């Protein structure tokens, strides 16, 4: 029997390479458009987006076609939600608001079968035709925890002791809110906190991730961030603005 599909993002992290993840995806058609561009993973939005369970299955299939790892952000750190998300074809989960060691342990154990955790025994789409699926799923499934509150940074030393977490992702926007800088993740205090968290993650021998854009991606990669997530929306907005400016400035 064939092996489970390889998780490209997890393989690149294991090789010490940077991973590129594209977000802002709401349909399988958009994933098909993004697929040929070469991103390693697709960030499917289950917390802030409108993706249904039926759509999630189709979107993860589209990721499989383009060898992009389907990584889905769930809306809560709940075992049943993690299980169903993985059963629908996701090869990784992003768990929001992980502020304590106990929350990190819950996230990791919800995504793994025994003896590593207690993910519900079913398997779903990625298990079809795969021998020894449960062990292979444990090897290929990614767990990403979001550090998006100042409480998480205060407890970071303990959180970093939790096994079977692939990426500790420092989320700037929510972090800024909890630090008293609503809507201003670029505030120097927030940026210092992000950089300090990244340094602590790396010093513990773990993988750091964060949100990046064209302006700061080089800086974060230089700091040692290996898991990057960005959105295509800004590129469309920039291109549209440039196009409209050219039209407005052309005499006819």
Residue ranges and their predicted role:
Residues 1-70, 74-77, 143, 164:
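Conserved N-terminal beta1-alpha1 strand-loop-helix module at the mouth
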Residues 1-23, 130-139, 195-203, 252:
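N-terminal amphipathic alpha-helix/helix-capping segment at the start of soluble metabolic enzymes
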Residues 20-23, 42-44, 70-74, 93-95, ...:
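Hydrophobic faces of well-ordered beta-strands that scaffold small-molecule active sites
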Residues 22, 34, 45, 93, ...:
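Conserved, mostly hydrophobic/aromatic
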Residues 23-37, 76-84, 151-162, 212-218:
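Short, acidic/polar
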Residues 59, 63, 101-116, 233-252:
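C-terminal helical cap(s) of enzyme catalytic domains, especially alpha/beta-barrels
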Residues 80, 90-167, 172-177, 251:
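Conserved anion-binding
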Residues 89-92, 112-120, 178-192, 229, ...:
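Glycine-rich tight-turn/loop motif centered on a GG-T
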């Amino acid at each position: 029997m064939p092996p489970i599909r390889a998780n490209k993002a997890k393989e690149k992290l294991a090789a010490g390479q940077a991973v590129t993840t594209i977000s802002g995806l709401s349909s399988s058609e958009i994933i098909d458009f993004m697929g040929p561009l070469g991103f390693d993973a697709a960030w499917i939005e289950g917390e802030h987006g409108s993706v249904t369970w039926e759509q999630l299955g189709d979107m993860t299939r589209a990721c499989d076609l383009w060898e992009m790892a389907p990584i889905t952000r769930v809306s809560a750190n709940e075992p049943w939600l993690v299980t169903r998300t993985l059963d629908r074809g996701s090869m990784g989960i992003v768990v929001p608001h992980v502020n304590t060691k106990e929350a990190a342990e819950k996230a990791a154990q919800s995504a793994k079968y025994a003896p590593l955790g207690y993910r519900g025994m079913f398997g779903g789409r990625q298990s079809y035709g795969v021998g020894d699926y449960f062990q292979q799923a444990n090897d290929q499934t990614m767990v990403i925890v979001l550090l998006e509150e100042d409480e998480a940074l205060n407890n970071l030393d303990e959180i970093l002791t939790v096994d079977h977490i692939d990426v500790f992702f420092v989320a700037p926007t929510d972090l800024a809110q909890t630090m008293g800088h609503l809507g201003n993740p670029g505030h120097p205090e927030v940026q210092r906190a992000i950089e300090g968290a990244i340094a602590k993650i790396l010093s513990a021998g773990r993988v750091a991730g964060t949100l990046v854009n064209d302006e700061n991606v080089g800086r974060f990669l230089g700091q040692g961030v290996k898991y990057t997530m960005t959105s295509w929306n800004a590129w469309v907005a920039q291109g549209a603005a440039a196009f409209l400016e050219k039209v407005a400035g052309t005499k006819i």
